[in-house]
C-alpha cells in the first residue's frame, strides 16, 4: 500500500473512528482488526469484513458483450484486470465470456499487469494488442480509462472507431463523455453505492446485523464508440 494509505490507517487509529468505509483494493483487512470497528467495503468483498457494497459486475460484462455482438462484432477482446490479483474486473470478464460462449462468438480475455494498473498507463500494451490482432472488431475494456487510452492508440494506428473497431468501457466516469468519439460504457451507480455504504455503516455501528453483500444494478450507456449518432442526439441509457 502507498504512504497515503499508511497515513489514513494511523489517522483511524489515533482518532478512534466509529467505522470505516474501505475503497482501496490493496489494504489488507488485517490492518483494521485492531481497531475493532465496523468495516464496509466498496467493490471488494472480504470474508471477515462487516459488509460489502458492489455493483453487478457480472451483468455489466454480459451487457457489454451483448451490445458489441448486436452491433455486428464477431471478433471480441476483453481487457481485464491484473493477472495475479482478484479484482471486480474478474466478474466482468465472467459475464462477458458467458455471453460470447452462448452466442458462439470468437473472443479472448487479455489480462493486464500490476505496472499498468499502478501507473494508469496502458498505451504500449494496447498498441501491441491491436497490432497482434488486426481482425478484432470489438473490445470491452474493464475501465473507461483503458477505453480512453485505447481511443488514442486507435488514432495513432489509423483504426477508425466505431467503423472498424467498437469499444465499450466500464464505470461511466467523466472522461467517457469527453473523448472523441464519446465512450459507450457500463454505468456504475457510484453515488448509490456510496450512500448504501454509509447507511450500512451507521446500522452496523448501532449494533444491527447488515447483509454481507449488497449488489446494485448497472446499465448500458450507448455513445459514439459503438454507434453513429445524429447531431444533437442525447446519450441513450438502456
Task: Describe the role of every protein-language-model region.
Residues 1-66, 130-131, 135, 238:
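Alpha-helical recognition/docking segments in bacterial nutrient-uptake
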Residues 1-4, 53-63, 79-125, 140-148, ...:
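Hinge/beta->alpha junction and helix N-cap segments in small-molecule ligand-binding domains
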Residues 18, 73-75, 137:
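Short acidic/polar active-site loop segments enriched in Thr and Asp
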Residues 22, 78-79:
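Short beta-strand and adjacent tight-turn residues that come in two discontinuous sequence segments
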Residues 31-37, 97, 102, 150-159:
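Glycosyltransferases and closely related glycan-assembly transferases
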Residues 65-76:
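Glycine-rich phosphate/diphosphate-binding loops that line cofactor/substrate pockets in enzymes
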Residues 75, 107-110, 160-166:
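Short acidic capping loops at alpha-helix termini that bridge into adjacent secondary structure
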Residues 127-236:
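Flexible loop/turn connectors
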